[in-house]
Amino acid sequence: MADFDAVLKCWGPVEADYTTIGGLVLTRLFKEHPDTQKLFPKFAGIAQADLAGNAAISAHGATVLKKLGELLKAKGSHASILKPMANSHATKHKIPINNFKLISEVLVKVMQEKAGLDAGGQTALRNVMGIIIADLEANYKELGFTG
């Protein structure tokens, strides 16, 4: 619970501008881990040089961060939020669990830069994301998805 609270203390700047921060997160994810871009069919043809500032990427980044905000505010009681997300990401989008680990590290960096997430907050965010990803993976296994 303390980890969730520590992350939520720095969540304000993210909440204030989901679109910009979301765009930064996805752009950095795609630049640092180019294979992840292929998992998003609508972004697959966008050149690396054109990622930053792309409206569709920023809009999807905002969607990602809004969902994460819901998960953070649930403070671990997130089964009803996570289950439908796990279902769509396993059965429709086929997103391997490792990609959530990759985006978590990107999120730590972006929140450090844009939301003032200090070392303790970074550890808290990694812990929170570890909980969310473990629960997501458990849902994946129930669905028979081993990605």
From Swiss-Prot:
It is found in: Cytoplasm, Sarcoplasm. Keywords: Cytoplasm, Heme, Iron, Metal-binding, Muscle protein, Oxidoreductase, Oxygen transport, Transport. It catalyses: Fe(III)-heme b-[protein] + nitric oxide + H2O = Fe(II)-heme b-[protein] + nitrite + 2 H(+); H2O2 + AH2 = A + 2 H2O. This is Myoglobin. The gene is mb. Heme b binds at residue 89. Its EC number is 1.7.-.-, 1.11.1.-. GO terms for molecular function: heme binding; metal ion binding; nitrite reductase activity; oxygen binding; oxygen carrier activity; peroxidase activity. It comes from the Eukaryota. Belongs to the globin family. O2 binds at residue 60. InterPro entries: Globin (IPR000971), Globin-like_sf (IPR009050), Myoglobin (IPR002335). GO terms for biological process: removal of superoxide radicals. Residues 2-141 form the Globin domain. GO terms for cellular component: extracellular exosome; sarcoplasm. Coiled coil: none annotated. Nitrite binds at residue 60.
